[in-house]
Amino acid sequence: MNPIFTKMVDAVEAANAAPDDYINPADGLKYCGKCHTPKEAFYPAELQAQGFTKHPVMCKCVAERREREEAERREYERMSYMTMLRSEAFRDMPAAGWRFESAAVTTPQLAKVRGYAQNWDEFKKAGIGLLLFGNVGTGKSYAAGCVANALIDRLESVLFVGMSDVVNRMQGNFGADRDHYMKSLMRPDLLILDDLGAERNTSFGKERVFDVVDKRLLTGKPMIVTTNIPLSVMKQAVDLDDRRIYDRILEVCVPIMFDGDSFRKSTAADNLKTAARLLG
């Protein structure tokens, strides 16, 4: 037997040894004193003929411990990656806690949006997004945030940004910096553009919005757009720049109307009642 190989086997056996190990007289192999399974195995006959008889193996309890440790390591890495994805997704939005499960009210619209998240693989493959439109305070941004968190739980990358912030960033950057920022908007699996129409109503602003929407469409990756602009206005837009933007969005985004009372007004009314009670 090769002396170097012998030393390697001896070193492994020494590292694998425990005080309660024992030799099983039935087969002459070393067994674990805890789980009573072999810590050695015989080489195939052709190797035994060359002087190689036994080699170390993991007993059952050591193998199970290694498996647990590996599972814990993988879970730690998964949770760390998920934390990173969430911090990247909500840089400028307080949406990390927005979830379908914790919604105060499950509206029909929220149920539809949840269906989008549940069938994400198919929508992602087809490059289909959502257009969430309706009055102020009806839960459009919350619904989009719920989708984001549901996808991040599946380790999908998401970026949730306000449209006005996008335009401001584009206006403040030039050349390579603007290109770099544009690429950052194209990179995630899902891009959420919040509050279309809140950006500056200028030719520059409209050009930047169109650039983002158009380039995102060309990537084939989905986007979710939220807006207070009625769907009828988007479909009947007279201004050429507006029509170009809306046509591109409607080409790949399924519209869902959010109506009903404003949740913000309801929350404000509840806060006033609480304050009145506490202040006497």
Which positions does each model-derived feature cover?
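A short, basic N-terminal segment
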Residues: M1-L110, S266-G280
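Active-site donor-binding loop signature of nucleotide-sugar glycosyltransferases
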Residues: C61, V105, M163, F258-G260
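P-loop NTPase catalytic core of nucleic-acid-dependent motor ATPases
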Residues: G97, P108-G129
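Short glycine-rich substrate-engagement loop in P-loop NTPases that contacts/grips substrate
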Residues: P108-A117, A148-P188, R200-S203, E207
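Walker A/P-loop nucleotide-binding motif
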Residues: K124-A144
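Loop/turn-to-beta-strand initiation segments
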Residues: E156-S157, R187-L190, T219-V225
